[in-house]
Amino acid sequence: MPKVLFLPHKILLPKSIECEAQTGETILTVALRNNIKLEHACEQSCACSTCHCIIKKGFFSLSGWSEKEDDILDKAWGLQSESRLSCQAVIGKSDIEVEIPLYNLNYTVEY
């Protein structure tokens, strides 16, 4: 079973939490199951950037990203080359480390 290490966050997570994950589930699913209150304004439909996270380890073990996710990420605060939407990033077989940015933009697109 892969493990997800959520790194400390000033408001949401005072200390790191390591969680077990199932291959094939999203980072957001793991966070919510472990009571990490990661925002997700669009209810996991890839229409906002509130669940933006930065993958510090294991980026290439996650599923590939879609053009839609890439477009939404362009609007995320603090975008980095290892940024993903946690509702879209599907966990593979390797352990990952996730940083939750201090801020997010509640930018939503209606399709």
Curated annotation (Swiss-Prot):
Q: Which PROSITE patterns match?
A: 2FE2S_FER_2, ADX
Instruction: Report the superkingdom from the record.
Output: Bacteria
The free-text note explaining how the cofactor binds reads: Binds 1 [2Fe-2S] cluster.
One Pfam family named in its UniProt record: Fer2
The UniProt record lists the keyword Cell membrane? no
Please give an example of a GO cellular component term from this record.
Answer: cytosol
Whether Iron-sulfur counts among this entry's keywords is yes
Which is one GO molecular function term here? metal ion binding
Alphabetized InterPro entries for the sequence: 2Fe-2S_ferredoxin-like_sf, 2Fe-2S_ferredoxin-type, Adrenodoxin-like, Adrenodoxin_Fe-S_BS, Beta-grasp_dom_sf, Fdx_isc
- Give the 2Fe-2S ferredoxin-type domain ranges: 1-104
The record's Gene Ontology biological-process terms are: P450-containing electron transport chain
- Cofactor(s) demanded: [2Fe-2S] cluster
Keywords, ordered alphabetically: 2Fe-2S, Electron transport, Iron, Iron-sulfur, Metal-binding, Transport
Residues binding [2Fe-2S] cluster are C42, C48, C51, C87
Q: What job does the chain carry out?
A: Ferredoxin are iron-sulfur proteins that transfer electrons in a wide variety of metabolic reactions.
Family membership: Belongs to the adrenodoxin/putidaredoxin family.
Name of this chain's protein? 2Fe-2S ferredoxin
- Which species? Buchnera aphidicola subsp. Acyrthosiphon pisum (strain APS)
